[in-house]
C-alpha cells in the first residue's frame, strides 16, 4: 500500500500538520527535492476536506462537493500525475419553491425570470430594478446583489439562500462576498470559467494517497496534544490547520461558519436530476 503509518520516530526536515491537499502537495514536492517529511492529521483519514468515500458504488464527498478547476496548465498537469480526471462540468440549478432556474446567473436565468431573450433586454431589466431600489454605491451584500442582477433574482435566488449560508440577513453582510459571483449576458451555464475542470476518477482520497506515496503519515493524532514533541521531530513545521488554534486563541476565536451533513440512501436511480441543486428559499 502506498500510504503507511509511522512506526518509529526520527528527525525530519519537515513536519506537515494536516494531510489535506496543501499538506499532501507540499510533502510530495519536498520529498521530490530529497527532503524527509512526516505528515500528521487528527482525523483518521487523509485528504482533509476533500476526503471521499465509496458508498453504494458512489464516491461521496464527505465534506461537501469539490470540483477541481484551474486555468493553469502546469497545475492541471501536476494533479493528472496522481489521478485521471473525468469531464464533469459544474452547471448548478436553483430551486425556488418548485421553480427551477439556471446557475450561475446567465441568459437562461434571465429568460426564465423575465422572459427576455437578448442581453440588452436583460441588462435593461437589471438597470431598471437597480434604479427603482435607489442604489448607487452598494454598502452591503443585499445592495450589491441587486446592483448585479436586480431585485427579482435577489429575492428569489439570493436572499434566502445567503441567509441560510451565513446565518445573517443580507443587509448585515459585506458587499464583497457576492462580487465574485459569476453573472453572464450569454447562454452559458458553466459555473467555472476555467480551461480545465473535473473530478478525480476514483475520488480525491485516492489522488491524495498517491501524492503521499513513500511519505511517513501518522493519522488520528492531534498536533496540539503533543506540540513540543512533534516540533522537536523536524527542522521546520508546515501548519495547515485553523490559524486561531495555532496561536492558542490568544486573540479570540475566529467566527467560522460551518454546515451539518445529513446522509440518506434512497432506492432510486436518480434523486434530483442534477449533481448540484441550490434550494434558495429561506426554509
Which residues make up each language-model segment?
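Conserved beta-strand segments of alpha/beta enzyme cores
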Residues: 36, 59, 84, 216-218
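N-terminal Rossmann-like FAD-binding beta1-loop-alpha1 element of flavoenzymes
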Residues: 14-39
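Mid-domain catalytic core of redox enzymes
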Residues: 33, 222-283
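Glycine-rich FAD pyrophosphate-binding loop
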Residues: 31-55
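Active-site/ligand-binding neighborhood in enzyme catalytic cores
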Residues: 97-101, 108-236, 240, 245-247
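Dinucleotide-binding Rossmann-like beta1-alpha1 core, especially the glycine-rich loop
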Residues: 56-131
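Short His-Asn-centered micro-motif
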Residues: 17-19, 40-42, 70-71, 202, ...
Amino acid at each position: 500500500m502506498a500510504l503507511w503509518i509511522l512506526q518509529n520516530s526520527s528527525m525530519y526536515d519537515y513536519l506537515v500538520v494536516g494531510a489535506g491537499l496543501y499538506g499532501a502537495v507540499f510533502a510530495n514536492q519536498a520529498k521530490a527535492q530529497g527532503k524527509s517529511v512526516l505528515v500528521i492529521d487528527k482525523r483518521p483519514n487523509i485528504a482533509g476536506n476533500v476526503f471521499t468515500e465509496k458508498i453504494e458504488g458512489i464516491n461521496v464527498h464527505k465534506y461537501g462537493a469539490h470540483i477541481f478547476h484551474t486555468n493553469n496548465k502546469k497545475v492541471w498537469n501536476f494533479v493528472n500525475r496522481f489521478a485521471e480526471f473525468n469531464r464533469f462540468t459544474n452547471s448548478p440549478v436553483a430551486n425556488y419553491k418548485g421553480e427551477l432556474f439556471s446557475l450561475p446567473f446567465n441568459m437562461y436565468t434571465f429568460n426564465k425570470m423575465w422572459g427576455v431573450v437578448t442581453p440588452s433586454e436583460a441588462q435593461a431589466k437589471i438597470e431598471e430594478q437597480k434604479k427603482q431600489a435607489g442604489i448607487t454605491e452598494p454598502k452591503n451584500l443585499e445592495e450589491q446583489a441587486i446592483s448585479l442582477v436586480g431585485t427579482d433574482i435577489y429575492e428569489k435566488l439570493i436572499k434566502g439562500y445567503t441567509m441560510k449560508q451565513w446565518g445573517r440577513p443580507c443587509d448585515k453582510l459585506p458587499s464583497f462576498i457576492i462580487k465574485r459571483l459569476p453573472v453572464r449576458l450569454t447562454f452559458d451555464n458553466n459555473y467555472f470559467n476555467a480551461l480545465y475542470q473535473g473530478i478525480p476518477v476514483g475520488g480525491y482520497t485516492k489522488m491524495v494517497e498517491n501524492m503521499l506515496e513513500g511519505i511517513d503519515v501518522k493519522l488520528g493524532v492531534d498536533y496540539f496534544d503533543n506540540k513540543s514533541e512533534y516540533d522537536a521531530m523536524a527542522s521546520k513545521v508546515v501548519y495547515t490547520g485553523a490559524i486561531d488554534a495555532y496561536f492558542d486563541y490568544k486573540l479570540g476565536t475566529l467566527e467560522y461558519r460551518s454546515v451539518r451533513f445529513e446522509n440518506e440512501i434512497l432506492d432510486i436511480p436518480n434523486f434530483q436530476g442534477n449533481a448540484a441543486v441550490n434550494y434558495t428559499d429561506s426554509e
